[in-house]
């Protein structure tokens, strides 16, 4: 039962009329209000602008922090990166009419060593920089021996030297001498880890400059084998990212190590095929990233080498020029034999479906796998005016005299690169399945428009070699070559 309540009507207080302000005071009040609004707007814009500036500065300073999702583009690199192609041209190999000339590999290496201040990291396959290593007495070994001497001088002058090398089954004298000089060396047992080898070839100096290319730590790679690589100067953004690949090798070089099921985040990268690094390269805007093989050695964000290579092939619309020592659409070292057409299919599709001009310059020497010839002939057979498929294959043979023929494992074109109208790919692997699925390798990919950049320089090198007298059609007589080419 509700209690009986007494309600009393409340009286709303009546507002007394306010006195009206004089007209001049009203105008003054409106002007002051307008001014206050403008001041507030300026303050808000200043705060927002300052916040944006500090955010940008933070990203520049702490670019390696994990601040981006998988599809967010990282901040550009503002280093004045300079790329220089470097080559080893074997003694006796001349291009008299060529307009393309690049610094030598030994010149570039010695320059990097002379300029090293704090650190040098080297990822390598094997070490034979002296005549003693190869049981030879060749004057041309002098360049390799000088490189070794300069390497030995680094640690005593305060440079931290780290060397990751494939677990060797050959000479150790160079590595032992470097250990004695104060360098650190770790041997990576890729055979145990992935049934492959550490085939990578790169240097990182002061986390600012780097070399990446086909040259091994071998005196023959400086004077008796044709090599190609790139030196990147003043490009700490890319150099630090390459150091992450080295750190993976360094980690795996520890005793009892194994490949992590998930790599620690410190190995991750933000730069890959989907989000390449924006850089200024030789004064021109470019996109770049580093890829790695095999896939188990690719932490989060790292594009596998094969995926990167195939993306270059699939993106080409005009031409694809390839220079590589070995080309085999097989798992070269597998037993039983396995067909592996990943790259082969991409090249055939590019030529047939998109009308892309494909050129392959394959090396031929005394150690070439004879089975390559059948696969190369199969590719070349697609050259047809009716289908408008334009694939051509040539063999590059380094001329050899009697004394040079006595140098073991020399006198070969060891290049491993590709160039299209859009991109350049410089790697460390031969083009067969095992190199991408089991063996450790690294590649640099750069997309750059215009002339004078890395891409156009690489194209010029390819055309120089393609049009040289050292390049031969597959139907060339073996007798006319005068070398131990096993593919003719």
UniProtKB/Swiss-Prot annotation:
Modified after translation how?
A: N-glycosylated. Proteolytically processed to a soluble active form that is stable within endosomes and lysosomes. During transport through the secretory pathway becomes proteolysed by cysteine proteases, thereby releasing a stable soluble lysosomal lumenal polypeptide, whereas the transmembrane-bound fragment is rapidly degraded. Its transport route to lysosomes involves ubiquitination and the ESCRT complex.
What result is annotated for mutating residue 206 to A? Loss of protein stability
General function of this protein: 5'->3' exonuclease that hydrolyzes the phosphodiester bond of single-stranded DNA (ssDNA) and RNA molecules to form nucleoside 3'-monophosphates and 5'-end 5'-hydroxy deoxyribonucleotide/ribonucleotide fragments. Partially redundant with PLD4, can cleave all four nucleotides displaying higher efficiency for ssDNA and RNA fragments initiated with uridine and guanosine residues and lower efficiency for cytidine-initiated substrates.
Name of the featured protein: 5'-3' exonuclease PLD3
- By its UniProt entry, which Gene3D superfamilies does this protein fall under? Endonuclease Chain A (3.30.870.10)
pH effect on activity, per entry: Optimum pH 5.5.
Reactions catalysed, semicolon-separated, are: Exonucleolytic cleavage in the 5'- to 3'-direction to yield nucleoside 3'-phosphates; a 5'-end 5'-dephospho-ribonucleotidyl-ribonucleotide-RNA + H2O = a ribonucleoside 3'-phosphate + a 5'-end dephospho-ribonucleoside-RNA + H(+); a ribonucleoside 3'-phosphate-2'-3'-cyclophospho-GMP + H2O = a ribonucleoside 3'-phosphate + 2',3'-cyclophospho-GMP + H(+); a 5'-end 5'-dephospho-2'-deoxyribonucleotidyl-2'-deoxyribonucleotide in single-stranded DNA + H2O = a 5'-end dephospho-2'-deoxyribonucleoside in single-stranded DNA + a 2'-deoxyribonucleoside 3'-phosphate + H(+)
Q: What is the documented disruption phenotype for this protein?
A: Deficient mice show normal brain morphology. PDL3 and PLD4 double-deficient mice develop spontaneous lethal hemophagocytic lymphohistiocytosis with substantial liver pathology and die at 2 to 3 weeks of age. This phenotype is rescued by expression of a single allele of either PDL3 or PLD4 or via administration of TLR9 or TLR7 blocking antibodies.
Topological domain, Lumenal: which ranges?
Answer: 60-488
Q: Which Pfam families match?
A: PLDc_3
Which species is listed as the source? Answer: Mus musculus
Q: Which residues are glycosylated?
A: 97, 132, 234, 282, 385
Hey, which family's this protein in? Belongs to the phospholipase D family.
Regulation of this protein's activity per its record: The exonuclease activity toward ssDNA substrate is Ca(2+) and Mg(2+)-independent, but it is inhibited by Fe(2+), Cu(2+) and to a lesser extent Zn(2+) ions.
**Annotated TM spans:** 39-59
* Induction (free text): Up-regulated during myoblast differentiation into myotubes.
| PLD phosphodiesterase domain location | 194-221, 409-435
- Write down the position(s) of the site called Cleavage: 71-72
Q: Which residues of this UniProt protein bind Mg(2+)? A: 436
What domain notes does the record hold?
The catalytic domain contains two conserved PLD phosphodiesterase HxK(x4)D(E) motifs that accomodate the phosphate group of the nucleic acid substrates, with one nucleophile histidine residue forming a phosphohistidine intermediate and the other histidine protonating the leaving 5'-OH ssDNA/RNA fragment, resulting in the cleavage of the phosphodiester bond. The homodimer has two independent catalytic domains arranged at the dimer interface.
- Name the SUPFAM superfamilies for this protein: Phospholipase D/nuclease (SSF56024)
